[in-house]
Amino acid sequence: MVSQKETVCVTGASGFIGSWLVMRLLERGYFVRATVRDPGNLKKVQHLLDLPNAKTLLTLWKADLSEEGSYDDAINGCDGVFHVATPMDFESKDPENEVIKPTVNGMLGIMKACVKAKTVRRFVFTSSAGTVNVEEHQKNVYDENDWSDLEFIMSKKMTGWMYFVSKTLAEKAAWDFAEEKGLDFISIIPTLVVGPFITTSMPPSLITALSPITRNEAHYSIIRQGQYVHLDDLCNAHIFLYEQAAAKGRYICSSHDATILTISKFLRPKYPEYNVPSTFEGVDENLKSIEFSSKKLTDMGFNFKYSLEEMFIESIETCRQKGFLPVSLSYQSISEIKTKNENIDVKTGDGLTDGMKPCNKTETGITGERTDAPMLAQQMCA
């Protein structure tokens, strides 16, 4: 618990990561100013209002990354800021003006609001694995010193290229701004986020992670060599880094690496009713995982609590409780899942944040095409 109640702002508060982060902050006694695009839309914010301690510690604020000065009022008087929100539109015909500039300018606008407030002691940014390993030749292990290759991305313009560019440019611009203005800035880099959720829609990251259950083959290549973090671990890591005075720089937050075959092996006996495949094209026992090292985070004293099995089981059980997964699967129920997921707002990214991004719009929010470099599709969802 915080020794003295602080006031923090959470952007993108209605989304998969944002809403869980708000919940954990409220539990710890923080006053939380949650920014959303439309506080009056109860369909999008009721799950926040229903949280424990919300009546006494939570307030909703209207803000939009595309509007200059939009966050000034929400941030004024805050002790800290958690920037989770991000614009996205993988079908944009003008990605420079509709995706890249809003991402970078939105980031800088929030940072300017922090400087203007003169009360913000730390700014924690939810970055993306897409800022780390989008490059032509993949390494076995990635850490915080790695950055995606913008020249390679711009030359290939693979699926989702504007997202990789926007997140990378935004974080680099943030580091420059923070150094110039003396703002205490930390970025946390999650991989594919899996776990239970309190939002009313199916998080796209779970559409990807649970593709062996739904037998959605278009997603298999994304988790062929996957990296994962439990939603609760990720949100606790946000708060941990905010509270640790010695924290500095970038922090990868990824607890497990696994191939799709590994995932299948523990899902099959646990959920025999789903008939999870036992083999996948191009995948065998010799396929090695690609690691995103969280050593810097764990060396600070942070401990991951959840196993790979736990994060998947909790995801599945939440999806079943909310009606996003049937008790057992038939071809008809698979079709129903795809139809439900057509309703996800992939163009505006409403309520979507790092770890829950659809990779391209099809009936399930992702294409089956292979990108120009291994693992690129993975980073669109992390």
Swiss-Prot record:
SUPFAM superfamilies: NAD(P)-binding Rossmann-fold domains (SSF51735). It holds the Pfam family Epimerase. NADP(+) binds at residues 44, 163. One of its GO terms (molecular function) is flavanone 4-reductase activity. The keyword Transferase does not apply. GO terms for biological process: anthocyanin-containing compound biosynthetic process. The keyword NADP applies. It catalyses: a (2R,3S,4S)-leucoanthocyanidin + NADP(+) = a (2R,3R)-dihydroflavonol + NADPH + H(+); (2S)-flavan-4-ol + NADP(+) = (2S)-flavanone + NADPH + H(+). GO terms for cellular component: extrinsic component of endoplasmic reticulum membrane. Its EC number is 1.1.1.219, 1.1.1.234. Pathway: Pigment biosynthesis; anthocyanin biosynthesis. Keywords: Flavonoid biosynthesis, NADP, Oxidoreductase. InterPro entries: Epimerase_deHydtase (IPR001509), NAD(P)-bd_dom_sf (IPR036291), NAD(P)_dehydrat-like (IPR050425). Bifunctional enzyme involved in flavonoid metabolism. Belongs to the NAD(P)-dependent epimerase/dehydratase family. Dihydroflavonol-4-reductase subfamily. This is Dihydroflavonol 4-reductase. It comes from Arabidopsis thaliana.
